């Protein structure tokens, strides 16, 4: 490998909204995520509602689209 071309790869912390903290290495540093393997329904077997209605409402507000304005072919 060539010297002095690789980025610094320090330890970092990934924090989930459920409170789970994972220690890893990353060039990004510490950051947070919404869902991790500790709280994801696939791994836990429990159903968890993820709020996507807010994203849809923001999209409609931004672009002026309404559910009834969709054209049917």
From Swiss-Prot:
GO biological process, one term: translation
Binding of Zn(2+), residues: 16, 18, 36, 39
Keyword list, A-Z: Metal-binding, Ribonucleoprotein, Ribosomal protein, RNA-binding, rRNA-binding, Zinc
Cofactor mode of binding and number, as noted: Binds 1 zinc ion per subunit.
Keyword rRNA-binding in record: yes
UniProt entry tagged with the keyword S-adenosyl-L-methionine: no
Listed NCBIfam families: L31 (TIGR00105), PRK00019.1 (NF000612)
Source taxon at top rank: Bacteria
Chain's role: Binds the 23S rRNA.
Protein name, UniProt field: Large ribosomal subunit protein bL31
Subunit structure comment from the entry: Part of the 50S ribosomal subunit.
């Amino acid at each position: 490998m060539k010297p002095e071309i690789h980025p610094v790869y320090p330890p970092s912390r990934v924090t989930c909204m459920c409170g789970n903290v994972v220690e890893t290495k990353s060039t990004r540093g510490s950051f947070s995520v919404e869902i991790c393997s500790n709280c994801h329904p696939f791994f836990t077997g429990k159903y968890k509602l993820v709020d996507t209605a807010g994203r849809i409402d923001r999209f409609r507000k931004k672009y002026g689209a309404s559910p009834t304005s969709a054209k049917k072919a």
